[in-house]
């Protein structure tokens, strides 16, 4: 029986789902998914899903961090040792707004691609796996794929692109061995079939789906309040950035410039 491990680039997958829900709100429910069950649907004849590794970092936003923790704990509760989270780290970056005199803080995730590479190579070297499912669109992982093929030619590799994401470099490295990447966007029914129950209970422990994921119309209040008529525009441009200073002498000009940038 071929042993399969799944290596999920959590940052890629989360942001792929986040983009997808803008055109189809059903995809917001797929934040609350059983990862072992989801990728069990992709197992081939003669294979068995041994373990799912989810590579992520503790979210810098306290509200998202609580939701993230609930998801990880629910998956662990359902799957025991078949699910494991490998943590990287978010680093703060202070940037200057190009449209105003303000400054803002954003965060950059580090270590995920290195951690994925290290765990895949280690599992191959120790013969802990026969087949790899890699979930990412990060072209930095081209090299470890090539090295595994060179040094461990009997190890199978299948590539999965998160919704709304893809990589030409990764596609080419797969096609070099006459393999095609799998687009998770085309497998909505598998996500539906892999949803966790709204309340996950086991051995006296219960975890509930975060209300924001259950109801797509709930909006979180930001910790730093900016003028309401700018909130949606600012979010389009800066995403999850946290405003630390906001001072612009010509608000109408700022709105006009921001509209042009985000249209």
Annotated model-derived regions:
Residues 1, 262-263:
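Short, Lys/Arg-enriched, disordered terminal segments
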Residues 1-106:
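Domain-level signal for Mg2+-assisted phosphodiester chemistry and nucleotide/NA-binding surfaces
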Residues 84-262:
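Nuclease catalytic cores that cleave nucleic-acid phosphodiester bonds
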